[in-house]
């Protein structure tokens, strides 16, 4: 049994109601596999899932932006469990390409002593409230200089947030994603319940499927805080 306070940081997925496709098709088991015998009054089902790899709270592996990058099947499990630091930028304005407020390198350097090599970083932008609404892509953003510093100098293990992204909107080719993923650093998008955390430092579990060739995957994202 895990000791500590458990906080679920993932959105519950709703088939047919997500921005990125998620559909379920339900069959009785013997419809698909006749060798599975089933009496007419017995509930015994199998389901087909049609789902985007970027549905809901999800992790984007390096393969998403680097054709030679690690994918969901090859990314090391030990890098999906580890120490995480929560950075609060809820005071930054969430907006579109014209109104989004930047988070600059000097603002990140305030936390420099906490940002150790391999550390997981989770940014609270106060954007989980926009999930599933017309404002679902409104957010603040990190400057490219700040992302470059996290990737190349600080060598973080993972970068995540409660928004649909973290870099400046309207810039072609997502250069922030590219520099992270060229350095085998995955990204978490659309986390939730960051405001439920009582501590800034906790253990993060990123529970993704191990599927060869998959660029991203919906996750059960779990924080465990020391009691």
Please identify what each model-predicted range represents.
Residues 1-227:
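Active-/binding-site microenvironments in catalytic and ligand-binding cores
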């Amino acid at each position: 049994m895990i000791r500590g306070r458990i906080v679920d940081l993932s959105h519950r997925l709703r088939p047919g109601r997500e921005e990125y496709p998620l559909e379920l098709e339900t069959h009785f088991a013997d419809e698909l596999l006749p060798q599975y015998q089933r009496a007419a009054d017995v509930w015994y089902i199998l389901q087909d899932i049609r789902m985007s790899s970027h549905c809901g709270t999800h992790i984007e592996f390096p393969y998403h932006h680097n054709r030679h990058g690690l994918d969901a099947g090859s990314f090391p499990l030990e890098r999906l469990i580890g120490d995480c630091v929560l950075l609060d930028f809820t005071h930054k304005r969430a907006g579109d390409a014209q109104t989004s407020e930047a988070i600059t390198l000097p603002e990140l350097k305030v936390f420099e002593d906490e940002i150790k090599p391999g550390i997981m970083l989770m940014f609270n932008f106060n954007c989980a409230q926009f999930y599933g609404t017309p404002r679902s892509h409104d957010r603040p953003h990190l400057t490219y200089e700040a992302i470059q510093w996290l990737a190349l100098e600080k060598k973080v293990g993972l970068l995540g947030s409660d928004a649909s992204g973290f870099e400046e909107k309207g810039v072609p080719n997502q250069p922030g994603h590219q520099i992270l993923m060229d350095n085998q650093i995955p990204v978490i998008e659309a986390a939730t319940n960051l405001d439920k955390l009582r501590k800034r430092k906790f253990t993060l579990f990123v529970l993704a499927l191990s599927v060869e060739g998959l660029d991203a995957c919906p996750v059960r994202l779990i924080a465990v805080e020391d009691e």
